UniProtKB/Swiss-Prot annotation:
Belongs to the elongation factor P family. Pathway: Protein biosynthesis; polypeptide chain elongation. This is Elongation factor P. Pfam families: EFP (PF01132), EFP_N (PF08207), Elong-fact-P_C (PF09285). GO terms for biological process: peptide biosynthetic process. Keywords: Cytoplasm, Elongation factor, Protein biosynthesis. It is found in: Cytoplasm. Involved in peptide bond synthesis. Stimulates efficient translation and peptide-bond synthesis on native or reconstituted 70S ribosomes in vitro. Probably functions indirectly by altering the affinity of the ribosome for aminoacyl-tRNA, thus increasing their reactivity as acceptors for peptidyl transferase. It comes from the Bacteria. One of its GO terms (cellular component) is cytoplasm. Coiled coil: none annotated. It comes from Thermotoga petrophila (strain ATCC BAA-488 / DSM 13995 / JCM 10881 / RKU-1). InterPro entries: Elong-fact-P_C (IPR015365), NA-bd_OB-fold (IPR012340), Rib_uL2_dom2 (IPR014722), Transl_elong_fac_P/YeiP (IPR020599), Transl_elong_KOW-like (IPR013185), Transl_elong_P/YeiP_cen (IPR001059), Transl_elong_P/YeiP_CS (IPR013852), Transl_elongation_fac_P (IPR011768). GO terms for molecular function: translation elongation factor activity. The gene is efp.
Amino acid sequence: MIEVGDLKKGMFIIYDGEIYRVLEASKHFMGRGSGLIRTKLKNVKTGLVREVNFPSGDKVPEAELSFRKAQYLYRDGDHYYFMTLDDYEQYALSEEEIGDAKYYLVENMEVDLVFHEGTPIGIELPTTVELTVVETEPSFKGDTVSGGGKPAVLETGLKITVPYFIEVGDKIKVDTRTGEYVGRA
């Protein structure tokens, strides 16, 4: 059991019989009463995000998870296939289990497979990934004066804003936590 005041981003807890990843946790104190811990939790299996407020001092069970290095192999329909690097066993995860991580998966990339009681329930991505720009507006001389950026579509279907100097075919780094452009690869 872990006290809700000690919850941090990235931790896994069990709430309502389901495993959740803590996306945000902040403390709010009211006048005379005890504090309130506001959390944003993501269901590991369904990918749904919900906001839950816990009274300060409450305790929740921490999920017992294990992580194994794996390589993303391919997608077939609604399933994504991974191979663990230690024993070369293959696992399939559904699109629901993968969630938005599907926009960052490139064949042969390494990820961490998340296991609960021997069953894969999700993946952990690296902080940044390299993706190729497949669609964006052409740049014109003087575009950089206004600052900002232009929309771009990446090889995985992810739509982000990139600087004006980025062209179709460029490899760029994208932060998997925020979905934002980091730099050229």
